């Protein structure tokens, strides 16, 4: 009797188990970097550490021809489109590249480009809210991007910014659409597996699939599609609102030039952030009273919900942004 195709619950449990172990590996690697190099280096290189952790996890399992821990947990194996042979080394390599490496490359390319397009072309400083922890260093690629975006006209910048926004949001919506489609049809859970044609077969025999669970998954897929449509509408509305606010800000920019120069001189006397060791930008207070940059402390709290100085525990929503604080 030929092995049966893996059911959607088995595929989802395998993916969740893999995500659990990948998260543990990321946390351990990030903690080691933080202990050895400090908080500033951890903030600067945490994305690269996460990438290396994912590549190591899939390199020791999928690339090596073994089951991942999640696949082993539910007893399923990967097969190529023939459903007879396991995927070749090339196909597995493409799978890991699409699943782990490509999202990192897209994020590293599109996010800095969006920040440069949002930046004031006259002063070269990004607008409020567009800074990130990794955006303070000026790498060669970032300088090249800044040089070429500076030569664009205002109309070209708006058009390119709109295209970047559509691409970033489109990729996120495509991922959500793909998951909803999986709930309905139950074949490919990850987009990378659809592109490479890799599916799952069940190794051990299990009782028949519950039809009620299958109907529930299809209903969940329909609800996910409706939620996706609503989210896309809200994101488009928010983008237009931000574009309108940015246009108004630039129209009134010249009237407040003198005030801005005075504020810049005042900012230059700001104390340092203890996380990045640079001038504190957008001061934010923790419940215990310590002050940090908004970008630094939010990035810190995304992995450790505690104060970096006194280690007092608190949820991220307790952070207090100090507007107009000097």
From Swiss-Prot:
It comes from the Eukaryota. Its EC number is 2.3.2.27. SMART domains: RING. It catalyses: S-ubiquitinyl-[E2 ubiquitin-conjugating enzyme]-L-cysteine + [acceptor protein]-L-lysine = [E2 ubiquitin-conjugating enzyme]-L-cysteine + N(6)-ubiquitinyl-[acceptor protein]-L-lysine. Keywords: Disease variant, Membrane, Metal-binding, Peroxisome, Peroxisome biogenesis, Peroxisome biogenesis disorder, Protein transport, Transferase, Transmembrane, Transmembrane helix, Transport, Ubl conjugation pathway, Zellweger syndrome, Zinc, Zinc-finger. It is found in: Peroxisome membrane. Pathway: Protein modification; protein ubiquitination. GO terms for cellular component: peroxisomal membrane; peroxisome. The E3 ubiquitin-protein ligase activity is stimulated by PEX12. E3 ubiquitin-protein ligase component of a retrotranslocation channel required for peroxisome organization by mediating export of the PEX5 receptor from peroxisomes to the cytosol, thereby promoting PEX5 recycling. The retrotranslocation channel is composed of PEX2, PEX10 and PEX12; each subunit contributing transmembrane segments that coassemble into an open channel that specifically allows the passage of PEX5 through the peroxisomal membrane. PEX10 also regulates PEX5 recycling by acting as a E3 ubiquitin-protein ligase. The three subunits of the retrotranslocation channel (PEX2, PEX10 and PEX12) coassemble in the membrane into a channel with an open 10 Angstrom pore. The RING-type zinc-fingers that catalyze PEX5 receptor ubiquitination are positioned above the pore on the cytosolic side of the complex. Belongs to the pex2/pex10/pex12 family. This is Peroxisome biogenesis factor 10.
């Amino acid at each position: 009797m030929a092995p049966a195709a893996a059911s959607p619950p088995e595929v989802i449990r395998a993916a969740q188990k893999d995500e659990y172990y990948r998260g543990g590996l990321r946390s351990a690697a990030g903690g080691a970097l933080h202990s050895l190099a400090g908080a500033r280096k951890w903030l600067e290189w945490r994305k690269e550490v996460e990438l290396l952790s994912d590549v190591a996890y899939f390199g020791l399992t999928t690339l090596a021809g073994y089951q991942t821990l999640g696949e082993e947990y539910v007893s399923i194996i990967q097969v190529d489109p023939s459903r007879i042979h396991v995927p070749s080394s090339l196909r597995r390599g493409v799978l890991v590249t699409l699943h782990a490496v490509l999202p990192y490359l897209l994020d590293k390319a599109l996010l800095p480009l969006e920040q440069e397009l949002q930046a004031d072309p006259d002063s070269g400083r990004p607008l409020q809210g567009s800074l990130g922890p990794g955006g303070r260093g000026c790498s060669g690629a970032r300088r090249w991007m800044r040089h070429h975006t500076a030569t664009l006209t205002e109309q070209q910048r708006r058009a390119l910014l709109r295209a970047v926004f559509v691409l970033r949001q489109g990729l996120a919506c495509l991922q959500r659409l793909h998951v909803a489609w999986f709930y309905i049809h139950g074949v490919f859970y990850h987009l990378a597996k659809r592109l490479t044609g890799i599916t799952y077969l069940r190794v051990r025999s299990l009782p028949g699939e519950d039809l009620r669970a299958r109907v529930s998954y299809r209903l969940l897929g329909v609800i996910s599609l409706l939620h996706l449509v609503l989210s896309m509408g809200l994101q488009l509305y928010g983008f237009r609102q931000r574009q309108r606010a940015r246009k108004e800000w630039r129209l009134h920019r010249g009237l407040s030039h003198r005030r801005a120069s005075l504020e810049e001189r005042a900012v230059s006397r700001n104390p340092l952030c203890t996380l990045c060791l640079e001038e504190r930008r957008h001061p934010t207070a923790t419940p215990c009273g310590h002050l940090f940059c908004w970008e630094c402390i939010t990035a810190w709290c995304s992995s450790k919900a505690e104060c970096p100085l006194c280690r007092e525990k608190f949820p991220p929503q307790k952070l207090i942004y100090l507007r107009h604080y000097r």
